Amino acid sequence: MYFSNCMHKLNKMLIVALAAMGFASANAQTTLPGSIQEAVKENVSAKAVMENIMTRTSVRKFKQQPVEDVKIEALLRAGMAAPTANDMQPWHFVVLKDKQDIEKYAESNKYHAEDIKKTPLFIFVCADTTRMAEGQGKELWVQDLSAVSENILLAAHAMGLGACWTTIYPIQKKVNGISRTLNLPDNLIPLNGIIIGYPDEPEQPKDKWDTKKITYGIPN
């Protein structure tokens, strides 16, 4: 029930955003594979959501245009609508949108400093170790925050933004370095940093459909 409610809320957010920008109907006949068109042909809401999923792609180059606060909040709300194990909600977000904060972060990453400076918005998705399951379920936060991150990526695309998931955890050197740069308390572990902004140029999604990677039923 919790998962169903979360998805219902996210779907409503995506549909509103898609409708507002006239995206839901644009190129729907050409971008959706035939099997998906057939599955959603009688449901406009489902069609809008599937269109958003199938056309999302990673974007790394952005216009020098700030992301509006109302959209930042929408992204965070979409993230917090994700399902989590035992409803632990082990998330904490660090948002960098001010130029001085972004430049400070860039100074700590000499290999990508110039690209970082050109990025309008960072959302670091972190795990709160005080809200984790015990025993064998301790690492479930990785799954939880992966669902959070995908919600943010899809919501960004729905609102006309581009985004890309940049890995931090489990590379310990990155975890330690970014934790120091962001001055994170000991109870927070950064899973990733999502870079977000208005795309500088159109990006085409990859066709990743591969029937060889599917098994139906239990093999003998």
Which residue ranges define each predicted feature?
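Acidic, surface-exposed loops and disordered segments
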Residues: 2-17, 26-220
